[in-house]
């Protein structure tokens, strides 16, 4: 099922853990609508800006899958409102800054950020169509959350961390 021009339901629900453990990761109609909103409001503008495919590393998670991976059963992933993503060839911090400055979102987290590894970690972003998006921006280094994104470092006109 196509959710938007470049994103399918299949890629939004793909989970190696669900496959390995035989967990049903099928969303309901409300979650599918939320995933579509996420595609149109966040993912399509992101893909258009960088003109590169966006890799969804984690999208929708059923409550059973959330439990299996130690996540909250009612996380925004379980509501179809959040994805974890990367863009091959684009430092994750650069992706996070672009999202912060260009789309409406509820929560943006630079996950497992390591300034010495621009390709390390991933970007978590959530959206809900209710109009009450918090615009919360956090960085998680593997131990603690801090408000905001780390400063980007530039060298030769490119982001290095």
Functional labels for PLM-detected ranges:
Residues 1-49, 142-161:
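Extracytoplasmic cell-surface/polysaccharide-interacting catalytic and binding patches
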Residues 38-42, 65, 81, 91, ...:
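Amphipathic alpha-helical interface surfaces
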Residues 49, 78, 118-120:
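A generic structural signal for short, non-catalytic loop/turn and secondary-structure boundary residues
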Residues 55-57, 82-86, 124-126:
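Structural recognition of the beta-strand scaffold that forms the well-ordered cores
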Residues 68-78, 113-116:
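Short, flexible, solvent-exposed loop/turn segments with mixed acidic/basic and small polar residues
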Residues 73-93:
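Acidic, His- and aromatic-enriched active-site or binding-groove loops in soluble protein domains
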Residues 87-161:
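Catalytic cores and adjacent binding grooves of peptidoglycan-active enzymes
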């Amino acid at each position: 099922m196509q959710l938007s021009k470049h994103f399918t339901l299949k890629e939004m629900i793909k989970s190696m853990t669900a496959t390995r453990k035989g967990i049903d990761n099928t969303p309901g109609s409300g979650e599918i609508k939320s995933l579509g909103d996420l595609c149109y409001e966040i993912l399509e503008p992101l893909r258009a800006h960088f003109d590169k495919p966006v890799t969804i590393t984690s999208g929708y998670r059923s409550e059973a899958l959330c439990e299996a991976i130690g996540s909250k059963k009612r996380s925004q992933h379980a509501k179809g409102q959040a994805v974890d993503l990367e863009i091959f060839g684009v430092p994750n911090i650069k992706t996070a800054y672009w999202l912060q400055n260009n789309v409406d979102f509820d929560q943006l987290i630079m996950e497992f950020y390591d300034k010495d590894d621009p390709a390390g970690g991933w970007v978590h972003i959530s959206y809900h169509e209710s109009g009450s998006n918090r615009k919360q921006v956090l960085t998680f280094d593997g131990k603690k959350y801090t408000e905001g994104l780390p400063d980007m470092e530039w060298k030769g006109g490119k982001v290095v961390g």
